[in-house]
Amino acid sequence: MSTKVEEILWAEKYRPKTLDDIVNQREIIDRLKKFVKEKNMPHLLFAGPPGTGKTTAALALVHDLYGDNYTEYFLELNASDERGIDVIRNKVKEFARTVIPGDIPFKVVLLDEADNMTADAQQALRRTMELYTENTRFILACNYLSKIIEPIQSRTALFRFYPLKKEDVVNRLIYIAKNEKAEYDQKALETIYDITMGDMRKSINILQAASAYGKISVEAVFKVLGLAQPKEVREMINLALQGKFTQARDKLRTLLITYGLSGEDIVKQIHREITSSEIQISEELRVLLLDYIGETEFRIIEGADDEIQLSALLAKMAIYGNKYIGSENR
């Protein structure tokens, strides 16, 4: 990526450059620092959700190993972008054949999204790893460890990356916003975390996009994401719980048509509101509704009609709202 683009993208501009710069995943960072100290390492397997620091940790590791000229010793490949295992194998062969003098007798290949490779491609990758193990170390990054074949897992040191804590993500967003002199609401930053579920890269991208509205507010965040405002989703839910099914369904159609939202988007927002403190209902009712929300999301993902499934969910809310809340509270 060019310097000009890096200056534009906050996610790259504020990416930690060294292991000491990384403030989370402390246990992993401490283990990686030992490799730097020993100037040796095995093949590594980084597993965890998107945006938890897998690529950042790999880049910081090779930077600390080789210094500012680490790019001469480092090859980054993406399993999704490459045209097949033959392309990857040829690139690795070309990369590994040249020897650069120095204290460290090996180069490093980072293969991102390795879990997108077929089992056959992974078997071929395993053979490639064995062929060049004398002067090349592989770092494989994946979102789903279960999709990596056992022969590769057994030949690598596993590092599990866990979702980042809310405090860590929000504090990082505050630091970036202040550094960029961007005005922000604390609630907006917390909302970004809730939406991204701790994906730091996605959180920073949303922060930057929302800053274009002048002030980083909750409204700006939802505009950037193309989602309905939370108050509109809450209004729909409350109408249903009050037994006003027709009005709730009309609100649903507005969200689907006017905002152009997908059923999956809406059901996720409903889930977010039901689990928040904004919707005042009993825990028993909350548990029941969450069960139906899960069923609705599953059916939508499986291909069922968005409006029919969401209308059925609103009908369930109306039925159980009447049962658990009662007409005296309306």
Curated annotation (Swiss-Prot):
Cited Pfam families? AAA, Rep_fac_C
Biological process annotations from GO: DNA repair; DNA-templated DNA replication
GO terms for molecular function, please? ATP binding; ATP hydrolysis activity; DNA binding; DNA clamp loader activity
Cellular compartments per GO CC:
DNA replication factor C complex
Q: Coiled-coil regions in this chain?
A: none
SUPFAM superfamilies, alphabetized: P-loop containing nucleoside triphosphate hydrolases, post-AAA+ oligomerization domain-like
In terms of superkingdom, the source organism counts as Archaea
Which keywords does UniProt give here? ATP-binding, DNA replication, Nucleotide-binding
Can you state the subunit structure given in the record?
A: Heteropentamer composed of four small subunits (RfcS) and one large subunit (RfcL). A homotetramer of this subunit interacts with PCNA heterodimer PCNA1-PCNA2.
The record's PANTHER family line, in alphabetical order, gives:
REPLICATION FACTOR C / DNA POLYMERASE III GAMMA-TAU SUBUNIT, REPLICATION FACTOR C SUBUNIT 4
**What is the annotated role of this protein in its UniProt record?**
Part of the RFC clamp loader complex which loads the PCNA sliding clamp onto DNA. The complex possesses DNA-dependent ATPase activity.
Q: Please identify the protein, giving its name as recorded.
A: Replication factor C small subunit
